[in-house]
A protein has these predicted regions:
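Residues that define the transmembrane beta-barrel architecture of outer-membrane proteins
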Residues: 7-9, 113-115, 190-192, 254-258, ...
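Gram-negative outer-membrane beta-barrel transporters
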Residues: 132-273, 277-286
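A short acidic (Asp/Glu
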Residues: 39-41, 221-222, 289-291
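Extracytoplasmic loops and strand-loop junctions of Gram-negative outer membrane beta-barrel proteins
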Residues: 1, 99-105, 175-183, 239-246, ...
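Extracytoplasmic gating/loop element in the C-terminal half of outer-membrane beta-barrel translocons
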Residues: 87-91, 275-373
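Solvent-exposed loop/turn elements at secondary-structure boundaries
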Residues: 1-184, 303-314
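Juxtamembrane/interface motifs at transmembrane-helix termini
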Residues: 47-49, 152-153, 229-230, 293-297
């Protein structure tokens, strides 16, 4: 069952205030509430993976001298008895198995929405240089997420990994079937950015500009995945379980971006002109499974039983002594000289603690959980 299609409204308002005289200084801003949409391929999954049996009707008439008309074959049989009584019915030898990953759509599912606001100042500097600074803030409402229905927390069962790290432990009602639910999350996801830019236009046809943007965003998930199964797992690292709809840093926003452009234009022969331009973009950003800008510190295996992936965020110990409560064990291996060596539990604890101290992020998260990157 698909959700209803109500009328939606996206109101917005903006202003442009000249504060320093014509073409010298402008204060501008706007705010609005915008209705978006979720990936429609997720909704399609609710139909194609509905959990109901589906079959194809094939009309076969081998002795026909001409193709049958549409009216002769476009018969719809609403009951099984009518389908079986059709002489042209072709049934498969083996019945189709029911989908193992049916998709359920929340009956109250709402389209994604964003409240977005911006405030900027444009100033004319000496030597006819245009300077702008702009801040943008947005907050998401009803972002769409995917959860599972056969893995759930009963409100009691927990797992203690260390005295400071106790988490929910999920129960699986049926391991042979994994139904997914498309639903809405909360209102904590947000985005903010600040941009500084300079631009200069010369009389002889040269235009140059430079801008720098710092930004960050937190989301319930990146919304990636052409299937609900991948939307449930991709960049959904969490402390307790993916079903808890925890927020973390979005992986699709460049934290820092420098953009420099230069172009030269020349008119000639009254009706012709040529422009040559150069663009430089520098950013610590890459959205690729093997080269993402951000990453998450997680356990090598799943510890809360929400699925088989390594999606549980690491707890960063507050002290070296706290590692004595962790489950380390001696590791024996054969080195390059074919000699057996032992990597003791104490050595592993020391190395792990040294790694935490040399990393600026982990060092600042002592006694806390790592954040989703």
């Amino acid at each position: 069952q698909l959700p209803d299609a109500p009328v939606t409204v996206s109101p917005r308002v903006g202003f442009n205030w000249v504060v320093l005289g014509y073409q010298k200084g402008v204060l501008r801003g706007c705010t609005g509430y915008f209705i978006g949409r979720l990936p429609f391929v997720w909704l399609v999954s609710g139909v194609s993976n509905s959990g109901c049996g589906q079959y194809q009707y094939s009309y076969i008439q081998a002795d026909a001298k001409s193709l049958p008309t549409f009216g002769e074959i476009s018969k719809f049989y609403p009951t099984v008895a009518e389908q079986l009584s059709d002489s042209g019915l072709s049934l498969p030898k083996e019945p189709n198995a029911a989908p193992q990953t049916p998709t359920i759509i929340d009956k109250d599912l709402k389209m994604n929405a964003t409240w977005k606001s911006s405030l900027a100042v444009d100033v004319k500097l000496p030597y006819d240089i245009n300077f702008s600074v702009e801040g943008i803030y947005s907050r998401d409402f009803n972002p769409s997420v995917v959860t599972t229905q056969n893995y759930y927390w009963d409100g009691k069962k927990t797992i203690t990994l260390s005295p400071e790290d106790t988490r929910h432990y999920l129960t699986c009602s049926n391991k042979s079937v994994t139904p997914y639910l498309i639903t809405n999350a909360g209102h904590k996801a947000h985005y903010e950015s600040l941009t500084f830019s300079l631009a200069k236009k010369f009389d002889f046809g040269l235009d140059i500009s430079a801008s720098y943007t710092m930004a960050q965003a937190k989301s319930y998930g990146d919304g990636i995945g052409d299937q609900v199964t991948s939307a449930y797992t991709n960049n959904r690292y969490s402390v307790n379980a993916n079903n808890d709809k925890e927020i973390g840093f979005a992986n699709y926003v460049a934290p820092n971006r420098l953009l420099i452009t230069a172009s030269y234009s020349k008119d000639y022969a009254k009706h012709f002109g040529t422009m040559v331009g150069l663009v430089y973009e520098g950013t610590n950003f890459g959205y690729d499974p093997y080269a993402a800008t951000r990453f998450s510190y997680t356990f090598a295996g799943n510890v809360v039983n929400d699925y088989k992936g390594s999606n549980n965020l690491l707890y960063v110990p507050a002290s070296r002594e706290a590692l004595d409560e962790w489950n380390f064990s001696d590791y024996t291996y054969t080195d390059a000289k074919k000699q057996k060596q032992t990597y003791t539990a104490e050595q592993q604890k020391d190395d792990f603690w040294n790694y935490i101290n040399q990393d600026s992020y982990l060092k600042g998260r002592k006694g806390k959980y790592a954040e989703r990157g």
